[in-house]
Amino acid sequence: MTWSQDLAHKTYSIRHWADGYFEVNDAGHMVVMPLGGDGVRISLPEVVDAARAAGAKLPLLLRFPDILGHRLGKLQAAFAQAQSEWEYAGGYTAVYPIKVNQHRGVAGVLASHQGDGFGLEAGSKPELMAVLALSRPGGLIVCNGYKDREYIRLALIGRKLGLKTFIVIEKPSELRMVLEEAKTLDVLPGLGVRVRLASLGAGKWQNSGGDKAKFGLSPRQVLDVWKVLRGTEYADCLNVMHFHMGSQISNVRDIAKGMREATRYFVELSRLGAKITHVDVGGGLGIDYEGTRSRSDCSINYGLQAYASHIVQPLASACEDYDLVPPRIVTECGRAMTAHHAVLIANVTEVEAVPEGRVPGVCDDEPAVVRHMREIYGELDARPAIELFYEAQHFHAEGLAAYTLGQIDLVHRARIDDLFYAISHGVRERLSHEEKSHRPVLDELNERLVDKYFVNFSVFESIPDVWAINQIFPIVPIERLNEVPTRRGVVCDLTCDSDGTVKQYVENESLDSALPLHVLRHGEAYRIGFFLVGAYQEILGDIHNLFGDTDAVEVAVDGRGYRIAQQRCGDTTDVMLDYVGYALDEVRRVYAQRIAAAGMSAAESKALSDMLEAGLTGYPYLSDVPLE
């Protein structure tokens, strides 16, 4: 089959997960389209080269703030269309929960969009302090999470300053504190209740909804809240009904089911006399990380318009049936707003190729297990391949046991491995996925016979959800996509941890245990992109092996194509050591003391001192200069 652009797109499932923001150009480069398919196309290798020329180093996080605005616009347009179709007059506000990515370059860009169609959500005191500064005058702020009196006072101060803050009651004890602090500050609070739905979405994040959810009020607790407020000056302050169906909901039916239950709460609260002006449906809108358009955990079987319609329709019908004023619909779809806007670029530092397998020459003292393996290899064209592979596995295991017991030496142990790999490659060539009986063995061989691509990054820092919850992220070389990828490899990071390996890859509208990659060329960089990493990954990343934040640049669209709008240096080694309690002055003193005690010349002492200082203040990651 002739390699082509279309085949590159198909191999890496790009058109299914990219959602119109990424594609391959004629030069074989991955390109980004921050304004969607009709906008400017920016070559990722060119951006990386420009950033490196400006001093940035790999691994490098590329942020495209224009994608944030474009995603927000698509979300608002989808709800505008759904409300038009269902003749719903309540309006819509897209709220960004900053826990998804609190960086100023993300939350600030989104907050710069004016109008009633955007708001912010905070789930902690530090987040609330950020949101109070980011929000526009009169802007909607949803205050979620655990609350103490200070949190509540800060939210109420926001209302006194002209912000539309709503304190969502998630625990029965919070209401009393809110009313007491409101009285002290002489302000009418904006109140909401978070109802705990029984409906439960499937997937990795299902515990954020359902009866066992961490947050939310039971039906009895909701009634108790209303009982306290009813007939008081605060009764008209209860304006928000909030709930959460889950995060990254894969199946649109789960959304429909959750909305049916939530709509009943809205109707009942309204019939009791509560003036619910906002229904906050929480998050749930998923991203198709896999590009499989399915109900699997890291995919979705619906589009943005279908999501909006399934939110609007139940509320529209309920308002018509019960003659209720349509409430403003609020969503907290932070993942959908931010995932596409960030790409991590890292260079491959080395490849450990899978042994091709060779048939060693016969020696006089050859153990029986080696002779058996040699006989199996000689029968590859004469006997069923699967039968031969199982025999090879048996004798390979027998050989390992014999070596452990001291019955064979290292030379013969190596010969057994050579023959086993030669047999494995020969068996794989004789199997086909078209034959159902071949598939289990072929899958096992494809998983075993892969190269290890060592990449200059940390799984735990840059894509921690891969380690924590087996999250899928699309991974694609950003160059040479006009060439056939002749190798299959797994991506391994720099950490001293076997978990620092990516185990599943997006390929051909499915998932596989390895990724099609290219052979490295001497003196030439080979760079890989990790896509859809804009939600949660920066914030959740940890410092395993003291690998810290990577360098990052913001790439903005302008009249000439693009410009590097902002560059942020990543953590240096001294920053990481200070973070874990090392006194840097003491570290430097010890270095100097040991150099002085080594009895070297002044010139050599200075050279070593300079190298130690450079190591202390340098980037924790490896050099991004390709090896000659």
UniProtKB/Swiss-Prot annotation:
Keyword tags: Decarboxylase, Lyase, Magnesium, Metal-binding, Polyamine biosynthesis, Pyridoxal phosphate, Spermidine biosynthesis
Residue numbers bearing the N6-(pyridoxal phosphate)lysine modification: 99
EC number of the protein: 4.1.1.19
Binding locations of substrate: 279-289
ATP-binding in keyword set: no
Gene Ontology terms for molecular function: arginine decarboxylase activity; metal ion binding
Alphabetical list of PANTHER family matching this protein: ARGININE DECARBOXYLASE, BIOSYNTHETIC ARGININE DECARBOXYLASE
Protein name: Biosynthetic arginine decarboxylase
